[in-house]
Amino acid sequence: RSGITQLLTTERIRVIDTASLSVKDIRENALYQPVRYVKPDTTLGIATKPFKAVIIGFGDTGQELFKFLYEFSAMVYAKDISTPFECFIIDPKAKVLEQELLSKCPGIRHDKDSLHFMCGRTEDFSREWEALIKEVDYIAVCTNSSEGNLSLGMQLLDMAYRLRDADKTLSIFTGIYDTVKFANASYIADYYRQHTTQGAQTELFRFELVPFGKREDIFSYANVLQEETIERAKSFHYEYQKTKLYKYGGKTEQDPEKEWTKRAEEFMQEGMSGKAKITQQEI
């Protein structure tokens, strides 16, 4: 019983990494993996074009996106591709952030030539954007302003329609944090999608606007509590079984995980009534 008491009285402090959770859906969606954009040769198992990305706003969320893109762009590329991964990071504090990144992640110094930090305030920057929009595969707009992110994302999408080849895939991710604003952004993204598709299958343009980072989803039960709650339930069930001498004689499996699995198997053997006692996550 002391084990049960300890489980119930242990104080818990949970630190929520909102930046990491903001990009979770992007990271876990196969459609948004860098491999989609590099024209993979499935016969040879290599990428036939480099992967180029732009990150606008290099705060916590921008840095999480960079980590994801840097890690998942590590593929086998064709021999004639000298710079397989390029990332353009645009932030008013570009120079300071560049030094901070290199000090935190010294391992990327050998890839320094692939990283381009830009403040975005020069007079020639509009011309630089016109060149970038023709070539990059992936744009993430993640400043602190939902309205600003959506507005800039739409401007970049319109620029792509004017300047970019229609068959070159481009995804523009916009950080939208408020629930109502996220719904509006999703409506706008669907509008663009519907009006750049001919019939049910034919895409006139391979460009898309993708909102991400809704706070309501970030602080959901599934993200914040589900895993911890199930683990505590396993431990509680294990300790509780030890007290049920009349049924098990104090004998349990070797660890909470095995005892939990045995519980699920027993319920499944009971048929539908037993299945109703098991949560969907367990099944």
Regions found by a protein language model. Give the residues of each.
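Cytosolic regulatory regions of ion transport systems
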Residues: 1-283
